């Protein structure tokens, strides 16, 4: 189980200095997918949000984000707020899909009929990485607790011939 390691890492990462730091966490748990429900992501997200809160983080929590637009709005909220913080932490639990060398978080209600739909409807993890790396936060952490079994893949025709 990954949660104890996450918690230990979190504790070590946030105790960089004795002074009070402003801490912001974005916590997302997606479970109610249109292709079947995942058992743990929402509960894991709620536990993580509670842990962050107990450690003095301001927490942005969202669960079962249905569309790419809604997902982007939550990320945008985090991005706009994080400038005022010393520590930025993003935790995602839900479906994750890799296409080529890119990784994507998947909203719960998007229909991925073919592999290329991931580009249109998924959230590229690089967006989160860019947000974290361009900030002036002392500490930035991204944890993807993503289910990598791809329930959409059986529908995809991967014939790549011209």
Q: Each predicted region: which residue ranges?
A:
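Glycine- and acidic-residue-enriched helix-capping/strand-helix junction motifs
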Residues: 32-46
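Cofactor-binding loop segments of dinucleotide-utilizing enzymes, especially the Rossmann-like FAD-
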Residues: 28-30, 64, 145
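A generic structural signal for short, well-ordered alpha-helical segments in conserved domains
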Residues: 45-49, 59
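Caspase-like (clan CD) cysteine peptidase catalytic core
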Residues: 2, 59, 68-93, 97-157
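Boundary at the C-terminal end of the N-terminal hydrophobic targeting segment
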Residues: 16-20
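Short glycine-rich His-centered loop
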Residues: 21-36
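Sec-dependent N-terminal signal peptides
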Residues: 4-14
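Short beta-strand elements in bilobed, periplasmic/extracellular small-molecule ligand-binding domains
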Residues: 53-63
């Amino acid at each position: 189980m990954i949660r104890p390691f996450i918690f230990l890492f979190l504790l070590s990462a946030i105790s960089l200095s004795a002074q009070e730091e402003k801490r912001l966490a974005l916590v997302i748990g997606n479970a109610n997918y249109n292709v079947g429900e995942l058992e743990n992501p929402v509960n894991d997200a709620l536990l993580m949000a509670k842990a962050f809160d107990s450690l003095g983080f301001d927490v942005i929590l969202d669960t079962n984000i249905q569309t790419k637009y809604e997902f982007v709005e939550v990320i945008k909220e985090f991005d706009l707020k994080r400038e005022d913080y010393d520590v930025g932490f993003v935790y995602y639990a839900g479906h994750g899909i890799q296409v080529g060398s890119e990784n994507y978080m998947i909203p719960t209600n998007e229909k991925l009929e073919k592999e290329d739909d991931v580009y249109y409807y998924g959230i590229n993890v690089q967006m989160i990485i860019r947000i974290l790396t361009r900030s002036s936060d002392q500490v930035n952490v991204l944890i993807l607790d993503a289910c990598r079994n791809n329930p959409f893949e059986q529908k995809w025709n991967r014939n790549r011939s011209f």
